[in-house]
A protein has these predicted regions:
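Short Lys/Arg-enriched alpha/beta "domain-start" segment
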Residues: 143-234
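"A position-specific structural signal for the A-helix of alpha-solenoid helical repeats
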Residues: 1, 35, 64-68, 102, ...
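TPR alpha-solenoid repeat register
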Residues: 31-32, 99, 133
């Protein structure tokens, strides 16, 4: 499988390994060089998704001797062979967290995300109490892998969709909502290769919880079961869902399942027969460049001064993390919410919380897709609220080639990590 295919499957570590192997065999391959450079500099990916990872080296002499004996007898040029070597070392010493981490890296480079997650879980359980920084660094990698193809059942960030048949009478409520300012239309997305619309019969909208008006204009709404008196025009609107209108179907999508439930309650008020139509419910992991999509559902009134726009956007972002995100259960925390994980005395849970905050900070630090303001949440404040710590270990972005070899001389020269 090519690097680009791996990247489309949300497996950036496997994509990096593909291109790095090409460069190992042919250092002058310009296509691989450009692809690798594009990945390492991708502005919309979190740091951990484009970092370069290295094998860990054992710090205990008896383990170093065991590693040297096993590595001397095996070919390390092949990732499958390298994975087998570290599996053998793990079998010989079940407490060897470094072998487990290296095994996880090999599996991740091969695109076996689910198996790599299991190996990283083992690393965290071995290292949490005695080497929390190394354990947290391992779990940051796990946060990348859980969103990739093959590990869907472990994902924590999802896009939820309702699909229902379209009737010709739907045009009426679509027009009414658009006129009321509750439904905003966008240009049809373009194909990246041809720059042509992905479809000529596709209409793309955002459904807002209130009208997005000019400052100073009255707001208007349209029968919502949760409707309230018209808010001040400076109050932001919130996206309930995106709406794709196609000739034969309607698709309502949101990263926020609660918003989508409101939409499902809202639809029968627009079209009484909506509750009688067959509804298909779909969910898929969010891509790595949109993991915080639920944090960016605020839409600001038109015509606000720049300082007021920035203040309102910052308040909405901070409110999301402080009052919504921390109360959402996560598989990465064994089903706990960050708020409940903060109360745990289990070192494994504590390390995972540290890692998830580190990864989420990286997600927040990159350029959000389609958002005009450069604002970020203060994750140190969130750490204080959750009594979490900032791990010292961070992956590097400056290494251009894959290191699948760990020969005995290298091990002897390497400093323990």
């Amino acid at each position: 499988m090519t690097g680009w295919n791996q990247l489309r499957l949300q497996r950036p570590l496997a994509a990096w390994a593909c291109w790095s192997r090409v460069l190992r065999d042919n250092p002058n391959d310009s296509a691989a060089k450009q692809a690798l450079e594009a990945l390492l500099k991708a502005p919309h990916l979190p740091h951990a998704a484009r970092a370069v990872y290295r094998f860990r080296m054992p710090s205990i002499p008896i383990r170093r001797a065991r590693w040297n004996a096993v590595l001397l007898a095996r070919d390390q040029e092949d990732l499958d062979a390298a994975a087998d070597v570290f599996a053998q070392l793990m079998a010989a010493d079940p407490e060897d967290a470094d072998a487990a981490f290296n095994h996880a890296l090999c599996l991740a480079w091969l695109g076996h995300n689910a198996d790599a997650l299991a190996a990283l879980d083992r690393v965290v359980r071995l290292d949490a109490a005695t080497r929390p920084d190394q354990a947290a660094a391992a779990w940051v990698v796990a946060e990348v892998l859980r969103q990739g193809a093959g590990a869907e059942r472990f994902a924590d960030e999802w896009s939820h969709t309702l699909v229902m048949p379209r009737h010709s009478r739907d045009d009426l409520w679509i027009a009414q909502l658009e006129e009321a300012g509750r439904l905003r239309r966008f240009a049809t997305p373009l194909r990246p290769d041809t720059l042509e619309p992905v479809a000529t019969d596709l209409q793309v909208y955002e459904l807002l919880d209130r009208a997005l008006t000019e400052v100073g204009e009255p707001t208007s709404g349209y029968g919502d079961p949760d409707s309230t008196p018209p808010p001040p025009p400076s109050r932001p609107a919130r996206v309930m869902c995106s709406v794709l209108v196609q000739p034969n179907e309607l698709r309502f999508s949101s990263p926020d399942p609660e918003s989508l439930r409101r939409v499902e309650t809202f639809l029968p008020m627009l079209r009484p027969d909506a509750s009688c139509r067959p509804v298909q419910r779909l969910s898929s992991p969010l891509p790595l460049n949109m993991l915080d999509a639920a944090a960016w559902l605020t839409r600001l009134p038109v015509g606000l001064p720049e300082d007021q726009r920035r203040r309102l956007a910052q308040e909405a972002l901070d409110d999301y993390y402080r009052n919504t995100w921390i109360h959402q259960p996560r598989q990465g925390l064994e089903g706990l919410t960050p708020a409940l994980a903060a109360e745990s005395s289990d070192p494994v849970i504590r390390v995972r919380l540290d890692a998830i905050l580190t990864f989420r900070e990286q997600v927040d630090a990159r350029s959000p897709v389609g958002w005009p303001l450069e604002i970020h949440h203060d994750f140190d404040d969130l750490r204080r609220r959750l009594q979490a710590r900032r791990p010292d270990a961070t992956p590097r972005l400056d290494q251009p080639h894959l290191k699948t070899q760990a020969t005995p001389p290298e091990l002897d020269r390497s400093e323990p990590q």
